Amino acid sequence: MNNLSYFTKTKLVWVILSLSLLSACATKTPDNLIPVQVNHVSQAQAWEMQGKLAVRTADDKFSTNLYWLHTADINELKLTTMLGTTLLSLTTEEGVAKLEVDGKVYQHDDAQELLTEITGWSIPVNALPLWITGQAAQDDKIINQDLQLRPTVLLSEKDSPPWRVEFNSWQKQSGAEIPRLLELTREQLRLKIQISQWQALSATTLATNNQKK
């Protein structure tokens, strides 16, 4: 990645804090995807979620609204205000990650590295689609489980230092059990994600065929 202008963490925090009294906005679901019910999150062909993201570091803390669209081909993450202002947009498609922030666009072949380089945050965007849905990656070590065998604490051992993920509460949405609140910590960085809405999605053609069976 060449000639990337460094966007400081302090500047981005200032932008978000200036809008922190505003709450979530609705984001339109792609026309080729429709809501479906599933028995388990792993059955979801795609999904979208809305919630809150709180970030605390040694020097700063803030919270904002989080939108995430996850499909087999696309990941789209947005930090937004209720008025529709996009503070940060990170999209990965066909192996290319694109970050839009502060009126500038940056590209890289790795979304996590791009976000870290431009914002200064080491947020695990590559692993979050699994953690948001209460699942562990192959490299994750499950430390504790509840009586329903859902993970309550796991460590991402492929990262050094590792991420510690705590699933503090659960809920049922789109027919599946998903986390309501999860907390991620790594050294002095702490992230809290509160999921207020999670919707399983399916391609319209596939959903129509299933209904006919």
From Swiss-Prot:
Transmembrane segments annotated in the record for this chain: none
CDD domains: LolB
Disulfide bonds: none
Keyword Transport (UniProt): yes
Location within or outside the cell: Cell outer membrane
Entry keyword annotation includes Protein transport: yes
Membrane topology annotation: Lipid-anchor
UniProtKB keywords: Cell outer membrane, Chaperone, Lipoprotein, Membrane, Palmitate, Protein transport, Signal, Transport
Membership in a protein family: Belongs to the LolB family.
Protein name stated in the entry: Outer-membrane lipoprotein LolB
Source organism per UniProt: Shewanella woodyi (strain ATCC 51908 / MS32)
